[in-house]
Amino acid sequence: MEAKPVAMEVEGVEAAGGKPRFRMPVDSDLKATEFWLFSFARPHMASFHMAWFSFFCCFVSTFAAPPLLPLIRDTLGLTATDIGNAGIASVSGAVFARLAMGTACDLVGPRLASASLILLTTPAVYCSSIIQSPSGYLLVRFFTGISLASFVSAQFWMSSMFSAPKVGLANGVAGGWGNLGGGAVQLLMPLVYEAIHKIGSTPFTAWRIAFFIPGLMQTFSAIAVLAFGQDMPGGNYGKLHKTGDMHKDSFGNVLRHALTNYRGWILALTYGYSFGVELTIDNVVHQYFYDRFDVNLQTAGLIAASFGMANIISRPGGGLLSDWLSSRYGMRGRLWGLWTVQTIGGVLCVVLGIVDFSFAASVAVMVLFSFFVQAACGLTFGIVPFVSRRSLGLISGMTGGGGNVGAVLTQYIFFHGTKYKTETGIKYMGLMIIACTLPVMLIYFPQWGGMLVGPRKGATAEEYYSREWSDHEREKGFNAASVRFAENSVREGGRSSANGGQPRHTVPVDASPAGV
C-alpha cells in the first residue's frame, strides 16, 4: 500500500466566513507548496516580488559607479589605489550589516528590517552626485554598499513563505533577479548618462545627475516593501507577537545557536567564493575589458552587463537544480550539486585568466563562468534554510556576510593596487574558488547524511531542530514551527524517506498560524 505523504497540502486555509485565506496551496506551516512566478497572490508571491525588486534596486545603487568609472576617474583624479579601495569599501560595508540584518529578521521580521535598511542607505546614493574627492567617492560607495544586506532579508523572507520542495527555487529566483541589478546597471548608467549628456549637460554634470535614477529606485522599493510586503504567511511579526501566535525569541538564544552550528560557517566560506567572486567581478570587469581590449565605454558596459544579466536564469537555475536533486537524492544531492557546480565555476575562472590574449575567448569564457558561479549561489541557499530554524535569519546573515568578506579579501589580495595584473588576479581567484569549495564535504546532517556519509540510524529531522530548544521551551510548544518544518522536509532524506518515511510527531500539526 502506498504511504501517504507526510507534508499536508491545504488548498487555501479556511478563515472566518469559510473563505480561503490564501489563493495558493499551502502546507501545514502555511508555506506555499507551489511557485507562481507571474502571480502577485498575497502574501506569498507579493512578498516574493517585493523581496527581489528591493534587492535589485540596492544592487543597482551599489554598482552604479563602475560603469561610469572612466568619467568619475577623470573628474576626481582617482588613482588605481583609490579605485581599488573604493571597490573594497563597496562590498565591505555589508559584512556586519548582513549579520545585523539576519538578527533583525529573526527578531522584528524581514519587512520592517528590509525597508528600514533601504531608507537609511538611500541618502548615500543621492550624495554620489555631489562628491568632490577620492575620499568622498570611497565613503559613498561604502555606505551605499551597506544596502546589499537586503539580500539577507530577501532570502529569509522566501524561506518563511515557501515550503521545502520550493524553497531552493524561491531563494534562487529572488536572489538571482536581485543580483540582476549588477548587470542591468552596467547598461542603465551609460544610457542615462548619454541621454543627459545629449540634452545639453556637460560630462562633469551628466554623470552626477545620473545617480538620481538609482536613488529614486531605491526609495520607491522601500515604500513598496512597507505597502505590499508581509513578514509571514500568518501576518506581520508585531501582530503575531501580540496575539501569542508566535514566540518572541531573545537575541542571546538566536546568536548562540547560530554561532555554534558549524554548517553555517562552512556555507559562509563557500559563499565567499561564489557570491564574493560575483561582487568582485562586478567591480573589475568593466574596467578590465575597457583597458585590456581597448573597447569603448558602451561596449565594455555591454560585456560587463552580460555577466550580471546571466542571473536572470543562472541563480534561479541553481535553486531549481538544488530542489530537483533533493527530490531524487535528498540533502546529499543538494550538497553534491553545490560542490560540483562551484568547482566547475572555479576551473572556468582560471581559464578566464589564461585566455586574456583573445577578446572573443575572454567574453565566451566569462559568460560560461557567470552561469556556474551564480548557479552555485542558488545551490548554497537551497541548503541554508535547513541548517537552523531558530536562527534562520542569522545563519542567512552569516552566509551572506561571508559573501562580502570573500569579496573584500579577494579584491584586496588580487585587485588592489598594481601587485597583480587583472588577468593574473582572475586566475588566482579561480584557484581560491576550487580550494574553498572543498569544505562542503564536511557538512553532515545526522538525519540526512552528507556528501560522503549516509544518515545516522534512527536520527530524525524533528530531533535535529528540537535540539535548539530547551525542555522547558519544548513543553510550552515554542518549537512547534520547527517540528512542522521537520515534517514538511521529509524528502530531504531521499526518495525512500519521502515515499515511506514517517517521522515521529510530538506536536500536533494544524493549519493555524501559531508558532509560524
From Swiss-Prot:
Keyword set includes Cell membrane: yes
Swiss-Prot/TrEMBL induction comment: Circadian-regulation with a peak in the middle of the morning and at the end of the light period. Isoforms 1 and 2 are induced by sucrose in roots. Isoform 1 is induced by nitrate in roots, but not isoform 2. Isoform 1 is down-regulated by ammonium, glutatmate and aspartate in roots, but not isoform 2.
Keyword vocabulary terms for this entry: Cell membrane, Membrane, Nitrate assimilation, Transmembrane, Transmembrane helix
GO molecular function, one term: nitrate transmembrane transporter activity
Expression sites by tissue: Expressed in the stelar cells of both primary and lateral roots, particularly at the site of lateral root emergence, root-shoot junction zone, vascular tissues of adventitious root primordia, leaves, germ tips and seed scutellum.
Membrane spanning stretches: 52-72, 76-96, 112-132, 142-162, 172-192, 209-229, 265-285, 299-319, 335-354, 367-387, 395-415, 425-445
UniProt xrefs under InterPro entries: MFS, MFS_trans_sf, NO3_transporter
Subcellular location: Cell membrane
BP GO terms, sorted: nitrate assimilation; nitrate transmembrane transport
Cross-referenced SUPFAM superfamilies: MFS general substrate transporter (SSF103473)
Major localization listed first in the record, in broad terms: membrane
Record Gene3D superfamilies: MFS general substrate transporter like domains
Domain of life from the UniProt record: Eukaryota
Membrane topology field: Multi-pass membrane protein
Pfam families: MFS_1 (PF07690)
Annotated region described as Disordered, given as residue ranges: 489-516
Family: Belongs to the major facilitator superfamily. Nitrate/nitrite porter (TC 2.A.1.8) family.
Misc: Plants silencing isoform 1 of NTR2.3 have impaired xylem loading of nitrate and decreased plant growth at low nitrate supply (0.5 mM).
Quaternary structure annotation from Swiss-Prot or TrEMBL: Heterotetramer composed of two NRT2.3 and two NAR2.1. Isoform 1 interacts with NAR2.1, but not isoform 2.
Role, per record: Involved in nitrate transport, but does not seem to be able to mediate transport by its own. Acts as a dual component transporter with NAR2.1. Imports nitrate with high affinity when expressed with NAR2.1 in a heterologous system (Xenopus oocytes). Plays a key role in long-distance nitrate transport from root to shoot particularly at low external nitrate supply.
Protein name: High-affinity nitrate transporter 2.3
Record organism: Oryza sativa subsp. japonica (Rice)
